[in-house]
């Protein structure tokens, strides 16, 4: 890192100004956390962050969960190429899940020769080394690791928020759902040592963080790869003991692995937020088998019953795919049945799209677009009906809200988040950001509330 830092300083001195950087994040919260580390490394070697993609060093941290995500990135890379013509000092780096696919790297080499650095998901800690290699060789640097069992600790990180932070507890995925590319680009499951996780959280709290989001592709698998196994329930109990930490969230649990121990820990916790994101994907047992989800409709509903028995007011959200290959009207009605029985606060809904490299992409009986679209609209209607009934129940109540930002549409309002992950907008000032305040939930607006802050 020292060699790269010296090289960056040399160029900055020649230009008579600091070199700037910009990191653009595509995709999930795992990518967002990786981008914070990339920003931390760039600041450590002497770059200064910029909001503009006209910066001297631009990083695209890519997502490849859907084919259109790739298309979007290719378009943006072309835009960067035009910017680079105007700025000979500009450097472009591409990383993330998309770069783990060999055909993507080949396309970058042939069609986007102005790109300087290409690396993947397993070696972001090498960014400074790769930058130095580009400075010295004057050629495109490509460094893709297909697999790794390495977890590098103590990387510098530049948090997006001062009051909340994501904390990786594990990397990779072993589930191989038939529609999903993630295990192929993120690798097999690897868990961080609990001591390293707790150390990071304590450091974050010392800097003012009051809420952490524990991150993993399947957090319920945490600890299985450790020399001395630790369960996710045990880790939650350890995190609960961190003084000064006020809220704990986690994402994402897999329904097949969410244990009674985790439910019990949540029930007794004073810090774990009243929310579980529990992806169902489909309500049809037959489709769940094709998806390789490893649970049935009945298994899922029984799990929801156990959760609600322990925590009657729990907020549940989910992911649902419509139009998976072979989906019949009966299969779809099973999905609507689950939505009605569970009563989700909200749902991330998707029309299935082929993802090359996954088993589902070659399955027979792909669903016609018009059929999938019609079912999608019926699903949205059912979810809205369900969520509005649930949200209305909390109108008039007073709840604790973590204030996150000035409202984007009206700067006289602040936007905060309830324990159940629902947004609340209310009159206030930016000095409240990062504080937990009491707010009366005056009016439900569907997926958010208008509120009134209560005076002490």
Curated annotation (Swiss-Prot):
Protein source organism: Lachnoclostridium phytofermentans (strain ATCC 700394 / DSM 18823 / ISDg)
Pfam name, any one: Radical_SAM
GO CC terms: cytosol
Places the protein is found: Cytoplasm
SUPFAM superfamilies reported in the protein's UniProt record: Radical SAM enzymes (SSF102114)
Protein role: Catalyzes the methylthiolation of N6-(dimethylallyl)adenosine (i(6)A), leading to the formation of 2-methylthio-N6-(dimethylallyl)adenosine (ms(2)i(6)A) at position 37 in tRNAs that read codons beginning with uridine.
Start and end residues of each Radical SAM core domain: 159-389
EC top class named in words: transferase
Cofactor descriptive note: Binds 2 [4Fe-4S] clusters. One cluster is coordinated with 3 cysteines and an exchangeable S-adenosyl-L-methionine.
Keyword terms of this UniProt record: 4Fe-4S, Cytoplasm, Iron, Iron-sulfur, Metal-binding, S-adenosyl-L-methionine, Transferase, tRNA processing
Chain's gene name: miaB
A GO MF label: N6-isopentenyladenosine methylthiotransferase activity
Oligomer status and interactors: Monomer.
Cofactor: [4Fe-4S] cluster
Binding site for [4Fe-4S] cluster 2: 173, 177, 180
Protein name stated in the entry: tRNA-2-methylthio-N(6)-dimethylallyladenosine synthase
Classification via NCBIfam families: miaB-methiolase (TIGR01574), MiaB/RimO family radical SAM methylthiotransferase (TIGR00089)
Domain MTTase N-terminal: 19-136
HAMAP family per record: tRNA_metthiotr_MiaB (MF_01864)
EC id: 2.8.4.3
TRAM domain location: 392-455
Family: Belongs to the methylthiotransferase family. MiaB subfamily.
Residue positions binding [4Fe-4S] cluster 1: 28, 63, 97
Catalytic activity: N(6)-dimethylallyladenosine(37) in tRNA + (sulfur carrier)-SH + AH2 + 2 S-adenosyl-L-methionine = 2-methylsulfanyl-N(6)-dimethylallyladenosine(37) in tRNA + (sulfur carrier)-H + 5'-deoxyadenosine + L-methionine + A + S-adenosyl-L-homocysteine + 2 H(+)
Keyword field contains Iron-sulfur: yes
